[in-house]
Amino acid sequence: MATNIAINGMGRIGRMVLRIALNNKNLNVKAINASYPPETIAHLLNYDTTHGVYDKKVEPIESGIKVNGHEIKLLSDRNPENLPWNEMDIDVVIEATGKFNHGDKAVAHINAGAKKVLLTGPSKGGDVQMIVKGVNDNQLDIDTYDIFSNASCTTNCIGPVAKVLNDKFGIINGLMTTVHAITNDQKNIDNPHKDLRRARSCNESIIPTSTGAAKALKEVLPEVEGKLHGMALRVPTKNVSLVDLVVDLEQNVTVTQVNDAFKNADLSGVLDVEEAPLVSVDFNTNPHSAIIDSQSTMVMGQNKVKVIAWYDNEWGYSNRVVEVADKIGQLIDDKAMVKAI
């Protein structure tokens, strides 16, 4: 039985999630909630500067949009409690506005009749379970939680990388830097922002700023709590980022041993290893959470290791959102079947 999905928000992540979800036969996208007319949404789905022309035909219709004959209802209400999730039998709402990334706010979707909610960003509080595929998705608990967080794109990258290193060699401590493409949170031209560096034009500078990725990692990989810290460098590219991770390990290692650990990790679809000398644009629209740049792996003093991992911060992350939503839906179905017996 297909999982009924609704997407709240049609920004960068919302549109990428919709494109990907429509290729998943386990999911039935029934509705989107956005403040734009169907003509605008259809156009932005059909033509994307970063990820290219969509391979499906999206048309605006009176009730919303039609994608290759599949009709999706368009709603426009800024208050999630007013949305007809109960009437539409919505199993999972993918919350992609960024405005309800707190359990106490996201619960509005539950009050409207949705069974579960998946946040497309780290939770800012409340009763929310954070999930990173390849790290703790086997602990997804629909009996205890109604609201889930897919963490951030950077946590989805560093999570599997840190897990492999910690499981195989043990992490003593480390520092990470994400070299991150520009995002909607930055300014095209100098304008006020609570982070004075992010107030500066994103197209003109490398901008040092904060990231919560290393701190959030303890939520999904508690074994490394207190062992990792990090920062971000925002760079003037439109997409694709990387994590530069330097750790001290409990064991002495070689470059080959480190790269082999990633190659042999049971993380198909989540973590990949690239041996060619590629650059960021080559990873655009790559679906993995992390792609190890094997040529950049370094070892100093036998146990200090530097690893570079690429990630498409839009497409890779959105793939994980869809996969986690799919898993939540499957668990809902399994629970319903047990009750029916």
Curated annotation (Swiss-Prot):
Binding, NAD(+): R12, I13, R78, T120, N184, N313
Binding residue positions for D-glyceraldehyde 3-phosphate: S152, C153, T154, T183, R198, T211, G212, R234
Keyword DNA-binding applies: no
A Pfam family: Gp_dh_N
GO molecular function, one term: NADP binding
Single GO cellular component term: cytoplasm
SUPFAM superfamilies, per database record: Glyceraldehyde-3-phosphate dehydrogenase-like, C-terminal domain, NAD(P)-binding Rossmann-fold domains
Subunit structure: Homotetramer.
Protein name: Glyceraldehyde-3-phosphate dehydrogenase 2
